[in-house]
C-alpha cells in the first residue's frame, strides 16, 4: 500500500511540475515574449570545378569538348557553410574519374586538413593504402598501393566549418 502512495505522489508532483512549466511558457508568450526552440544546423553547399591548362591558358572543363591522354585535370572542391551552425569533423571527398589516374602529391587544402585515399571505392580511407602482395616464397606481404589504384581522395579538416565560411580542396588527375 505504501508503494502505491509513493507512486501516486510522484505522479501528482510530476503533473504539477509539467503544468507549471506549460503555464509559465503561455504567460511568457502572452506578455509579448517569444518562446521557441531553435537548433543551429550547418548547411553545406559543395561544388566541384575542373580546369585544364592548354597552350598556357587555363580553361574550365565546361568549355572543353574532349580531353587527351597525358593531359592533367585540376579539380577544386569548394565548400561553403550557408547554415547557422558549425559543421564539425567536416570532410570533402573527390572521386578519381574513370580513365584518369591520381597525380601523386597533388592533394592540397586550405586550412589544416588531413588527406587520405581510398582504393576500394570509398569504403575505407588511409593516408597510405596498403595491399597484399604475394611473395616468391608464397607468403603474403602488405605493401603500399600504387597511386594508379586510388579511387577517391578525402580531405578532413581539424577545425569546424563555421557559418559563412568557405574551404577549398584541390587535387589533380592525369588522363590515361
Label the model's feature ranges.
Residues 2-16, 22, 26-176:
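Exported/extracytosolic protein signature
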